[in-house]
């Protein structure tokens, strides 16, 4: 399942992404905002999407993904990464989309509605969704280091 979320700045982009995913026969769920609200706050939607992705992953659905959109993708990525098990990435090119999946097993894609064209966004989404994690020893080791720190409970150690 692909979970979508956007604040007011990413709302129109999200609606276009829904059309793109539908045309691509990809299953998704829109977690909001469901209507344009100029007063909404991005963390609400970042947490909502990240919590659903994390829950699905914890229940064994390794295909769970999220796509978050705000003005520049920065706030969404910071907020989503506060949820245990989430590896949210801000992507601006097909190459980094590919590497974020191959090297980092990223599970949430963050996009900036005001920083990349929709044409590029579609290419990024297509690349990100179609790229698998490469289980090379060094990538596994690095992800384990991140997960160990995340599970330690004390970010100052």
Where are these regions (language model features)?
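Short, conserved beta-strand edge motifs with alternating hydrophobic and charged residues
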Residues: 5, 29-32, 66-70
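Short hydrophobic/aromatic-enriched beta-strand-loop microsegments
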Residues: 28, 86-93, 133
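C-terminal binding/interaction regions
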Residues: 3-12, 16, 94-157
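A short beta-strand-loop structural module common to alpha/beta enzyme folds
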Residues: 27-39
């Amino acid at each position: 399942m692909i979970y979508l979320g956007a604040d007011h700045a990413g709302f129109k982009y999200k609606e276009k992404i829904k059309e793109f995913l539908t045309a691509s026969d990809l299953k998704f769920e829109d977690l909001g905002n469901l209507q344009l609200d100029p007063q909404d706050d991005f963390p609400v939607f970042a947490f909502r999407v990240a919590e659903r992705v994390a829950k699905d992953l914890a229940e064994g659905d390794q295909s769970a993904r999220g796509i978050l959109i705000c003005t520049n993708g920065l706030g969404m990525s910071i907020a989503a990464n506060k949820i245990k098990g989430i590896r949210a990435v801000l992507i601006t090119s097909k190459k980094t989309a590919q590497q974020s999946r191959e090297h980092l097993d990223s599970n949430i894609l963050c996009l900036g509605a005001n920083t990349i064209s929709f044409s590029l966004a579609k290419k990024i989404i297509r690349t990100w969704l179609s790229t698998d994690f490469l289980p090379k020893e060094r990538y596994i080791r690095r992800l384990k280091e991140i997960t160990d720190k995340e599970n330690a409970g004390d970010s100052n150690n």
